[in-house]
Amino acid sequence: QVGDDSGGFSTTVSTEQNVPDPQVGIKGKANRGKMDVSGVQAPVGAITTIEDPVLAKKVPETFPELKPGESRHTSDHMSIYKFMGRSHFLCTFTFNSNNKEYTFPITLSSTSNPPHGLPSTLRWFFNLFQLYRGPLDLTIIITGATDVDGMAWFTPVGLAVDTPWVEKASALSIDYKTALGAVRFNTRRTGNIQIRLPWYSYLYAVSGALDGLGDKTDSTFGLVSIQIANYNHSDEYLSFSCYLSVTEQSEFYFPRAPLNSNAMLSTESMMSRIAAGDLESSVDDPRSEEDRRFESHIECRKPYKELRLEVGKQRLKYAQEELSNEVLPPPRKMKGLFSQS
């Protein structure tokens, strides 16, 4: 039976448990709670177990059944908008003092290495095509138990902005930030923020295939700034992690070769590449008999070729049967020694 360890064999590592101590002999004040004191009991109606009492009364059930032919899973995993519509890691930074701001540009160029350049999936994706046009979704995850007032805003390329990649006091006025569309938040009330960065550029599109860093080239989408206030670094920890994703309005133009194509595996034997699984075969896989018959019926040049071959086989078969079953004349009777006269 499953889970029966009577035979002395178990797939799980046995852990030696502490012997129950009915006399409440726990040593140390830090390891002693109110429930460990003798005579103290839980209040009437209080739940002392982790399990939810509501779930214990529910009838076990599975997903609702659907009619045959009705699809339950409707997400298209081959769609670029589905895959890149999920948030992918962009950057992270930590504040060390109060009343500071941090600005980072969203540069699509592949020549800039992290942390100033796109990392991982984003770097690979934005080099699969020449030009990008459209808005982007920015997700900001806040880490740390703090009660800090914050403000985030997006600055298009070419407008006034604080020094990127440096934690410093902002030199911009509050009126200027508000005109750009600032978003205010409090870290005690929210742990994540999602902002749709607009497509606001004097260019028709930006490219990840160009060199450059910052806002001096045609590869920068824009700059994002985050400012904080009421932050005490001595007893608090505040960190921001940013993630980027495309939107349904994103447009990708002119596919190109993947990044780092010179790192692809090279060999003189094509069969070894196919055997290694990194190269598709140039011919189709062996088809089933049903597929072969179906394709033979829709062949337009000689639609009755297979039929004529099959008829020829049957004619040869019948001819062989006729030869083997041909009626021969009865044998002649011979007079021998034992024949009666």
Swiss-Prot record:
Give one GO biological process term: symbiont entry into host cell
UniProt cross-references to SUPFAM superfamilies, sorted A to Z: Positive stranded ssRNA viruses
Compositional bias per record (Polar residues), positions renumbered to this chain: 8-20
Site (Important for VP1 folding and capsid assembly) location in chain = 273
Cellular compartments per GO CC: host multivesicular body; T=pseudo3 icosahedral viral capsid
Looking at the record, which segments are called Involved in P1-2A pentamerization?
Answer: 270-340
Query: What InterPro entries would the database entry show?
Result: Hepatitis_A_VP1-2A, Viral_coat
Gene3D superfamilies referenced in this protein's UniProt entry, alphabetically: 2.60.120.20
Keywords assigned by UniProt, alphabetized: Capsid protein, Host endosome, Host-virus interaction, T=pseudo3 icosahedral capsid protein, Viral attachment to host cell, Virion, Virus entry into host cell
- Site described as Cleavage, located at 1-2, 269-270, 340-341
The Swiss-Prot or TrEMBL record describes its family as follows: Belongs to the picornaviridae polyprotein family.
Entry protein name:
Genome polyprotein
Per the UniProt record, the source organism is Human hepatitis A virus genotype IA (isolate LCDC-1)
